[in-house]
C-alpha cells in the first residue's frame, strides 16, 4: 500500500510525502501505521478519525483532516491522505 499525504494551506502544498507499507497486516492496520509514520515525519499529533472522515476514506480512499480532527492547533488548512496503490 502506498499513501500520499500532504499539508495544504491557502490552496498550496506546504509538505508532502509518500509512505509505503507492504506488510502482512490488514488494510486498517496498514492505514493506521502509515498515519503514524506521516504524523511523525510532519511532527504532528495523530488526528482523530471522525465518522465523516472514515466514511470519506471508505468511499474514495481519500480523506481530509482539518482543525476539528486535531487536539492541538495546526498551522495549515488541512492534511489530506490519498491511497495511491493497494496490495
Predicted regions and their residues:
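Short, flexible N-terminal segments of the mature chain
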Residues: 13-41
Amino acid at each position: 500500500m502506498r499513501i500520499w499525504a500532504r499539508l495544504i494551506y491557502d490552496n498550496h502544498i506546504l509538505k508532502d510525502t509518500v509512505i509505503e507499507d507492504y506488510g502482512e497486516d490488514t488494510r486498517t492496520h496498514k492505514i493506521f501505521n502509515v498515519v503514524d509514520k506521516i504524523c511523525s515525519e510532519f511532527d504532528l499529533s495523530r488526528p482523530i478519525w471522525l465518522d465523516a472522515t472514515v466514511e470519506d476514506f471508505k468511499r474514495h480512499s481519500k480523506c481530509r483532516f482539518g482543525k476539528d480532527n486535531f487536539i492541538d492547533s495546526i498551522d495549515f488548512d488541512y492534511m489530506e491522505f490519498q491511497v495511491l496503490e493497494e496490495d
